[in-house]
Amino acid sequence: MTYHPELAPRRRSWLIATPLMFVIVLGIAWSGFWYWAAGQAETRINDWQAQQASAGRVFICGKQTLGGYPFRIEARCTDVSVEVKDSRTPVALKLKEILVVSQVWDPKLFIAEFTGPLMASDPGEEPYATATWTLAQASVRGTPNQPDRASIVAEGLKLVDAAGQPLFDAKHSEFHARVQFGSWPNNPAIDLAANLKAASGPGLSPYARDPLDADILAVLHGMKDFVVKPLPVLLREWQERGGRFEIQSARIAQGETLATATGALSLTQAGRLDGALQLNVIGLEKLLPAIAQQKGVALSLERAAPALNAIDRAVPGLGARLAPQAQSISAGLLGLLGKPVDVEGKRGVSVPVRFSDGNASFGPIPVGQVPAAF
C-alpha cells in the first residue's frame, strides 16, 4: 500500500495550545491581581501613617519595600523611627526592621517579625532603655471593625538602661488576646493569656530579682475599640464603659515560693484602682521582706498593730505570745492574718488583697495608695 502523507490524520494542535494559553492568561491575570493588591497595601500603609501623624504619632521608614510575589505580600520597613507626642511624656523609638507578611488568599491574617535592637529615648536625646531579643514575632487576625485575635512571642528578651544595667529579661514570653465569639461590638469581652519563662526584673522590683515563671488567664471587659490613643485617655474611656479586668487564673513560681491568684479589678471615676484579689501563697515569709523593701510600700508592724490588737481582744493572750516588738511581720502575718489553704498539694496561706479607691491593703494591713491611672 502506498503511503500518502496528505491522507495521514492531522494532530489536533489546539488541544495542546489551549491549556498552555490558559496557563499564560491565568499567570498574567494573577500577576495583575498581585500588583494591584500590593498597591492597595502600600496605599493603606501610607494612609495609616498619615492618620497616625495627625494624632501626634509619627512613623517613619528609612526604606520601605514591597515583595513576596507570587503568593505573599511582604512589607519591609528598615531603620524604623517612631515619635509619640500625644503622651504626657513624649517618647522616641528606633527599631532596625519590621517585616509584615500577608497571604494573598488570606488577607485578614498578618504576621510580623521584628529585628532589634529597639531603643527608647526622649526626642533628640540618647536612649534611656534598649531592648534586644533572639526572636520576636506577632500575628493579627481580623479587621479594625471586626477584630479576632492577636499574639506576640519573644525569645531571649532583654531590657537594659542607659548604663547597660539589666531592667528585665525573659527566656521566653508570649501574650495572646482573642475576642470572645459573639461579644463584639455590643458587649466586648477579650480573653487574655500570658506566659513567662525564667523572667526577672531586677531594675523594676526588688522581689523580681530572681527568675520566675508565670501563667496568667484573664478576661478584659469593656474594650470597644483598638484605636491607638494615649494610655490615660484609653483607660478613662474604658472606665466610663464599666470596664473590668477579671483574673481567672494566675500562677507565679519563683524558687520555693509559689503564688496563685483570682479576682477582678476596675477603676473608679477618679482613675483609682478598685477591686479584690484572693492570693494563695507557699513561702509567704520569703516574699514579705522583699515587698517591704519596695519604695512606697511600708509593710511594718506599726501599721499592723491595730489589726493585731483587734485579734488580741478577740483571743486574749494570743497577741502577747506574738507581740509586735518580739516578732517579725512575716511571723505575725503567717500566724494571725493568713488563712491556711492547700496550694497544689502543699500547705500555704490565703490572703485577700483589696483595693478601695486606690487604697491597697494586704489582708487587714494597709500598704499604701496606688497612683491614679488618669
List each model region and its residues.
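Loop-centered beta-sheet repeat module
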Residues: T2-E6, L20-V23, G156-V219
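Extended terminal
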Residues: T2-L20, G62-K63, L234-E240, A250-I252, ...
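Hydrophobic membrane-insertion alpha-helices, especially the h-region
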Residues: A17-W34
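Alpha-helical transmembrane signal-anchor/signal-peptide segments
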Residues: W36-A53
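N-terminal beta-strand/beta-hairpin edge segment
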Residues: S54-P185, A250, A261, G283
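Extended lipid/amphipathic-ligand handling interfaces
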Residues: Q64-L66, L95-W105, A131-N145, A170-P185, ...
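Outer-envelope beta-barrel architecture signal
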Residues: I73, P188-I190, G271-L273
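Flexible, membrane-facing loop/turn or short amphipathic-helix motifs
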Residues: S81-P90, L118-A129, G156-D169, V179, ...
